Amino acid sequence: MNSIIVNKLIALQERFNVLEKLLSKPNAIDDKKHFCTLAKEHARLSEIVVCFERWLDIKQEIINTKKLLEDVDMHDIAQDELKTFYLNRNNIEKNLKILLLPTDSNDKLGCFIELRAGTGGKEAAIFTGELFRMYVRYSEVRRWKMEIINATYGECGGYKEIIAKIPYRGAYSLLKFESGGHRVQRIPHTESQGRIHTSTCTIAVIPEIPDIELPSIDPHDLRIDTFRSSGAGGQHVNTTDSAIRITHVPSGLVVECQDERSQHKNKAKALSVLGSRLHAIEMKRRQQEVSCTRRNLLGTGDRSDRIRTYNFQQGRITDHRISFTSYKLNEIMNGELDLLIQPIIHQHQSDQLNKLLELE
């Protein structure tokens, strides 16, 4: 294992030992706030230290077993044991590297996913509908239940815009890299001359922030409008003004919700989406201040970023951030999205580790 990583682990082990001494003092609980801070740090380091100590034990076992290779009677047994030790050591090293990576506090949360048709007119709306179906299928594979917050239907099918919530632990960690511009290349059904058209859909995935952590919103900053819910083709599906449109005047953000028959439920959902959007904007602003908007291989998540191309003529899908191409387009569109998500996560972890080593 890299000496820089080993030195960092030794430093964390020493810090862990210091924390244990501090937390075991009789008066440690006197300052409850400070005690909680130390306890959280102790809990965070605990798994790393336990894993590192296992690595040190195996390292010593390897040294001891290598000495047995000189013994003719023990040579074969020692070789078999070494194979097992090397395998265990490699697995532990992989875990340690992941444990050392910076954590995203939002990774344990559910998420909102917003899809908007871009350039391409009717075909873009159809493509947006197909992408949403892909996420629905993926949610079914994961046994997640997806809740539609608001939908604006396309003239020939699909959606001009659709917002959904996936209120399941860890959903954000898997879907956050879907944010960005998605491009499709194919011959539309309405194309009589067989020309390939390009259409786009922009996607934003934001964490579902618990109500207690949402930013406080001044009611005076909100403009709330009511209207009748409408379905596909624009027909009204409700005779009462149950749909809600909330405008946050200072930021210009607008959220609509017409999924529920109750105006109060629609308002609550819309406020939840608005709060999460405002939180995401604030978090992004803070990250930009710290990192000076340094772009890594996974992009910034801006909706203008073209992250992926779907080529139906060739059955090919390419993620441009990691130069990854798969010819399993049909499988991915039918919910096997992990074929794309896992390579992106692995590359992201590798990139984070490289940055960690650069900082040492």
Swiss-Prot record:
InterPro entries: PCRF, Pep_chain_release_fac_I, Pep_chain_release_fac_I_sf, Prokaryotic/Mito_RF, RF-1. One of its GO terms (cellular component) is cytoplasm. One of its GO terms (molecular function) is translation release factor activity, codon specific. Methylated by PrmC. Methylation increases the termination efficiency of RF1. The modification N5-methylglutamine is found at Q235. It is found in: Cytoplasm. Keywords: Cytoplasm, Methylation, Protein biosynthesis. It comes from the Bacteria. The keyword Protein biosynthesis applies. Pfam families: PCRF, RF-1. HAMAP family: Rel_fac_1 (MF_00093). Peptide chain release factor 1 directs the termination of translation in response to the peptide chain termination codons UAG and UAA. Belongs to the prokaryotic/mitochondrial release factor family. This is Peptide chain release factor 1. It comes from Blochmanniella pennsylvanica (strain BPEN). The gene is prfA.
